[in-house]
């Protein structure tokens, strides 16, 4: 979904590799392992402070210069929560010589908090709740930004077991719907 002209498709390890391979196959753009992950760094978006999230992202990934230099890159990630990771990876790829970085997200935009165990409890901390898609694209310094549609996400899995609250604000229990409306 959301094609663009590019030389290479890269997925953010490890959560976005399968989505990147799928995008590559559908678009005909070659897939490369253009990012290398330090396996000893935990998920960065769940760190307790912004400073710790930024430090974790800096230590977590490295770009493979020989695969991105002078190329237009499609970067596939599973989601954008606060934008910290996306901004750092776009900068990392451009510092490694990428001409352009087009970000494609394998989920709809996250615009609502999660009250079911994921560390994103307020709208204010969510990049796409505070900004339009165009503003979010500028904030992460990407050349373009697109999200998977809700419809496409629903087609890809078992609808009855998929919580969509963080994408559309429809919580499966009224307790959390009321909490959001306060």
Residue ranges, per PLM feature:
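PRPP-associated nucleotide enzymes
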Residues: 1-182
């Amino acid at each position: 979904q959301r094609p663009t002209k590019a030389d290479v498709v890269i997925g953010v390890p490890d959560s976005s590799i399968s989505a990147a391979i799928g995008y590559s196959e559908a678009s005909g753009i070659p897939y490369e392992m253009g990012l290398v992950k330090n396996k000893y760094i935990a998920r960065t978006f769940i760190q307790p402070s912004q400073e710790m999230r930024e430090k974790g992202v800096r230590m977590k990934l490295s770009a493979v210069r020989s695969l991105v230099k002078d190329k237009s890159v499609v970067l596939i990630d599973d989601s954008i929560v606060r934008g910290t990771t996306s901004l750092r990876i776009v900068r990392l790829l451009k510092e490694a010589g990428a001409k352009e970085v087009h970000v494609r997200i394998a989920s709809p935009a996250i615009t609502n908090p999660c009250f079911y165990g994921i560390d994103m409890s307020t709208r204010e901390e969510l990049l796409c709740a505070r900004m339009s898609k165009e503003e979010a694209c500028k904030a992460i310094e990407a050349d373009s930004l697109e999200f998977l549609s809700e419809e496409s996400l629903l087609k890809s899995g078992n609808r009855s077991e998929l919580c969509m609250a963080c994408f559309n604000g429809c919580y499966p229990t009224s307790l959390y719907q009321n909490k959001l409306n306060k």
